[in-house]
Amino acid sequence: MDYENLKEQWSEVEDRDGVRLSWNVFPSTRMEASRLVVPIGALYTPLKEKPDTPLLQFEPVTCKQPCRSVLNPFCQVDVRARLWICPFCLSRNPLPPHYKDITANAIPPELHPSNTTIEYRLSRPAPSPPIFLYVVDTCQEDDSLNALKESLVMSLSLLPENALVGLITYGTMTQVHEIGYTECAKSYVFRGSKDYAPKQVQEMLGLGQMPVRPGMQPQPGRPMPMGPASRFLMPVSQCEFQLTKALEQLQKDPWPVANDRRPLRCTGVALSVAVGLLESSFQNSGGRIMLFAAGPATEGPGMVVSSELREPMRSHHDIDRDNIKYYKKALKFYDTLAKRTAHNGHIIDIFAGCLDQVGLLEMKGLSNSTGGHMILVDSFTSSMFKQSFVRVFEKDGDDNLLMGFNGILEVLTTKELKVTGLIGHAVSMNKKSTSVGETECGIGNTCSWKMCGIDPTSSYGIYFEVAQGGPSHAQPAQKGMMQFLTYYQHSSGQFHLRVTTIARNIGGPAGDPAIAQSFDQEAAAVLMSRIAVFKAEVDDGPDVLRWVDRMLISLCSRFADYRKDDPSSFRLEKNFTLYPQFMFHLRRSQFLQVFNNSPDETAFYRHVLNHEDVSNSLIMIQPTLDTYTFDQEGGQPVLLDSASIQPTHILLLDTFFHILIFHGETIAQWKKAGYQDQEGYENFAQLLQQPKEDAMELITDRFPLPRFIVCDAGGSQARFLLSKLNPSTTHTTGAYGGVGAQTAQTIFTDDVSLQTFMDHLMKLAVSGTN
């Protein structure tokens, strides 16, 4: 089967099951697997929206303990004996009595060959409606605070009627607003400089009295008997007026700030009070703590910088030199808080609206461990914030929020495979099973992970190894299988279970060409990028780049055709040709190169990469570039190369985080002269309009909203484009500073070009000594 057909097949599987694998035929031995270089991995989007996934209104049929796999199309069913055989543990299970009428032609939906992904609506109701607790920074200028208040008031109308909402504001002090008290505005105040233990928070808020009685089953539709926390968290339908009033009356923090100081801001206390409030009464009920930070924490636990302006925020350089006063202590504080929050089943979203850093680097664990969002904007007045914030509350066709709470993902494998770990926004459930591997990749040593927050685009990299071989005379299996079970609280108030079961052939003896043909270079590039970013969090930058290079050289020397020590004979098959260039762009990307980015930006970019699926991640690693000219209709894809910059062309660059329209030199001059407004130049006006329309289309379903930039050749904003292009025409190419560089853009850089990179790669791959 040729590569184009295979790609189409993989994309159909992705649409149906939300899965892309690095290898679509599995090696038969551990030895063979180690020679593949790229691990067997799956990029899985559990809640991928697909209208045709059947939603079954009954409990799933499961295998006996400890296996608990779910009945699926790959099970053998003996209709006469009313039995089914589990492909994972090979146990025989009786079919339930109500399946007595099934025949070979009349089978239940979960056994239908096309239903490899299926969803069950379980009878277990959620313990309470979803909770939204707004934590608002009041140390900000009036225009920014007013814009934020508007967005928050508007968001109340997007929440389900029964959702519980609450409000905490903070500056020098933290205030918990008692919205259940209607006589006047009333709030509980916590000192910003003090570290409160969970018990103290609960006592001060008077939450210790009435724990929910164990064994009391919540009834769908009937509200839980509310404890003392109902003074702070109330259904939107009951408190919308009161909360709107409280939000509208918010004012800038009254504490005076000297000219040479930052405002005193106790972000750490505000978050730990929010976590304590939800922890006391709503453990393992779906809820979001939404933090709106307008600057860095300068006071109390979790402070990231002092209030003196002469002390700058830490940079990557400071961190490398260990010149960091608050970093380790703050990181420890937020990581402990993140563990607590994840254990309680709650989500923390961070919305940072500030030109300076707010401390995302220290706080990143809060969102990364709980599946929360992280949005980085210059100000809450920007449309980037307003539109991204609205998208958090998007709904499906049945008017339910497109967000799941308290998810648990469990992975089962047949005996040939073992799971080594997961990279994505989750925490380990420390669950051991026969499916758990010996090695560890990402969050390992478990077959089950907890995702407090999960949405239809949340994607997880799951990595596998081949099990140690059994006796050599044993009959090798024909197929290796995996089953992904995702339990989560649906926003309609019930628990759901999404089941995806996939099977792939197992290759023949060593060197089976089917394995090489089954390599999906796009999925592999994204899975390897996640490992590289995971390593970059703990290792030095240069070490990670060396690891990326070593892996690429090994892969090429294993799968390319060449004569030893002859680089000119080097050839890669079609399904490997793009992989080296993905790695070239990954090495230069902001995920691994921190130069020119603040530590907060690096934390943000890495957070988003670990959330997205294959196609979006590839745009981040290797942005797309389209060109628009008079002699063609619409945009045409061109190489991400400095040679693509031409004076009479318009370029549209999509890096996922930025969408940029670049006018070549001549186009920019015509535009400046106003030709587009003159009669007879309608085609020029049309040419200027076309990339804008295409850019708007790209923005429509993107989250977080990308920054939109329009710039001209020679303008300062053009740096966003130049930094992404392969520098094939630099000030050093060609004699006298570049022959042939009259038309293409000269890029002033010491970075190697893709061509030089490939030359070195070929040389190293064909020399048997790598």
Curated annotation (Swiss-Prot):
CDD domains registered for this protein in UniProt: Sec23-like, Sec23_C
Protein name from the UniProt record: Protein transport protein SEC23
Chief place where the protein resides: cytoplasm
GO BP annotations, alphabetical order: COPII-coated vesicle cargo loading; intracellular protein transport
Membrane topology type: Peripheral membrane protein
Its job: Component of the coat protein complex II (COPII) which promotes the formation of transport vesicles from the endoplasmic reticulum (ER). The coat has two main functions, the physical deformation of the endoplasmic reticulum membrane into vesicles and the selection of cargo molecules.
CC per GO annotation: COPII vesicle coat; endoplasmic reticulum exit site; endoplasmic reticulum membrane; Golgi membrane
Location of this chain's protein in the cell: Cytoplasm; Cytoplasmic vesicle, COPII-coated vesicle membrane; Endoplasmic reticulum membrane; Golgi apparatus membrane
Sorted UniProt keywords: Cytoplasm, Cytoplasmic vesicle, Endoplasmic reticulum, ER-Golgi transport, Golgi apparatus, Membrane, Metal-binding, Protein transport, Transport, Zinc
Similarity comment text for this entry: Belongs to the SEC23/SEC24 family. SEC23 subfamily.
One MF annotation (Gene Ontology) recorded for this entry: GTPase activator activity
Highest taxon of source: Eukaryota
Assembly information from the UniProt record: The COPII coat is composed of at least 5 proteins: the SEC23/24 complex, the SEC13/31 complex, and the protein SAR1.
Entry binding sites for Zn(2+): C63, C67, C86, C89
